[in-house]
């Protein structure tokens, strides 16, 4: 090899990479979080705050259930908070989930590349185990993170308890409605049975109710005013048909069996059942 060529090769400066060629871009977590916070359609759940220098998760429950799965492969809010901590985000409000990072600003996506993920620094070989142990478990770094994670877990537990209470209240309300419907059905069936066995029962109750209504109308208005009825329920039609009334008109006007009539009818039915039971016992 020519000595002159080798000397020239040694004197040449090393190649310089083009500026920005090897520059790493922002992490997918940061870009997805930036897009998520900037979506105007979900500002009621998560949005920018303080003029765009911080962001707030207004509704953590809806955030975990609807937004996180769209951007990440999980719906765990505490895991999302831990990720923010690893990238240097700080929780700046005690009463709400508001986070801040100097490189995470509204409308400045290019600053995301300045946010670096925290990594545990390796200890120098000269340090022994007792010297490196405090750096690996620095209370000043771990305790705030543990407090935030505990707060997240307590919030999730509180949300689950509230949902459980609402579910129990709904089940109890449904049970009451079902029991009420079953009780009313039993009364109706008992009444129909007694009406078949005693044809005069319905007519007597119907006439008593009519007499009381007429007396009340006379006392209040001084005359009898009959109101036209357009509809009869199936049960009312059945009861009238059993007594031969059908849909007959009295003086050209239909009469309606309202809820008060059926309540009175069922009360009389219950009283009659009690009287029969007493007679059987005697």
Swiss-Prot record:
Keywords: Activator, Cytoplasm, DNA-binding, Nucleus, Phosphoprotein, Stress response, Transcription, Transcription regulation. SUPFAM superfamilies: Winged helix' DNA-binding domain. InterPro entries: HSF_DNA-bd (IPR000232), WH-like_DNA-bd_sf (IPR036388), WH_DNA-bd_sf (IPR036390). GO terms for biological process: response to heat. A motif (Nuclear localization signal) lies at residues 208-212. Exhibits temperature-dependent phosphorylation. Residues 1-24, 117-139 are annotated as: Disordered. It is found in: Cytoplasm; Nucleus. GO terms for cellular component: cytoplasm; nucleus. Residues 137-196 are annotated as: Hydrophobic repeat HR-A/B. Residues 26-120 bind DNA. Residues 1-11, 120-134 have a biased composition (Low complexity). PROSITE patterns: HSF_DOMAIN. Gene3D superfamilies: Winged helix-like DNA-binding domain superfamily/Winged helix DNA-binding domain (1.10.10.10). Its main location: cytoplasm. It comes from the Eukaryota. GO terms for molecular function: DNA-binding transcription factor activity; sequence-specific DNA binding. It holds the Pfam family HSF_DNA-bind. A motif (AHA) lies at residues 259-268. A motif (Nuclear export signal) lies at residues 232-240. Transcriptional activator that specifically binds DNA sequence 5'-AGAAnnTTCT-3' known as heat shock promoter elements (HSE). The hydrophobic-rich region (HR-A/B) corresponds to the oligomerization domain. AHA motif is a transcriptional activator element. Homotrimer. Belongs to the HSF family. Class A subfamily. This is Heat stress transcription factor A-7b. It comes from Arabidopsis thaliana.
């Amino acid at each position: 090899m020519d000595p002159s060529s080798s000397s020239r090769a040694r004197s040449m400066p090393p190649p310089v990479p083009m500026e920005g060629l090897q520059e790493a871009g922002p992490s997918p977590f940061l870009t997805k979080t930036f897009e998520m916070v900037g979506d105007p359609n979900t500002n009621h759940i998560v949005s920018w705050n303080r003029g765009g220098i911080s962001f707030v998760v207004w509704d953590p429950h809806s955030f975990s259930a609807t937004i996180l799965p769209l951007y990440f492969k999980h719906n765990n809010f505490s895991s999302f908070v831990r990720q923010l901590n690893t990238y240097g985000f700080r929780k700046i409000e005690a009463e709400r989930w508001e986070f801040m990072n100097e490189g995470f600003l509204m409308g400045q996506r290019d600053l995301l590349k300045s946010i670096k993920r925290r990594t545990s620094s390796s200890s120098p070989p000269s340090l022994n185990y007792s010297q490196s142990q405090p750096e690996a478990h620095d209370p000043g770094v771990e305790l705030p993170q543990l407090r935030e994670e505990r707060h997240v877990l307590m919030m999730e537990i509180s949300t689950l308890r509230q949902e459980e209470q609402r579910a129990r209240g709904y089940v109890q309300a449904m049970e009451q409605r079902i029991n009420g419907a079953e009780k009313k059905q039993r009364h109706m069936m008992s009444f129909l049975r007694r009406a078949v066995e005693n044809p005069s029962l319905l007519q007597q109750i119907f006439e008593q109710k009519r007499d009381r209504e007429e007396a009340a109308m006379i006392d209040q208005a001084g005359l009898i005013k009959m109101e036209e009825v357009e509809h009869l329920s199936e049960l009312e039609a059945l009861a009238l048909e059993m007594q031969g009334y059908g849909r007959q008109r009295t003086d050209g006007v239909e009469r309606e069996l309202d809820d008060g009539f059926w309540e009175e009818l069922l009360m009389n039915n219950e009283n009659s059942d009690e009287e029969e039971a007493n007679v059987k016992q005697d």
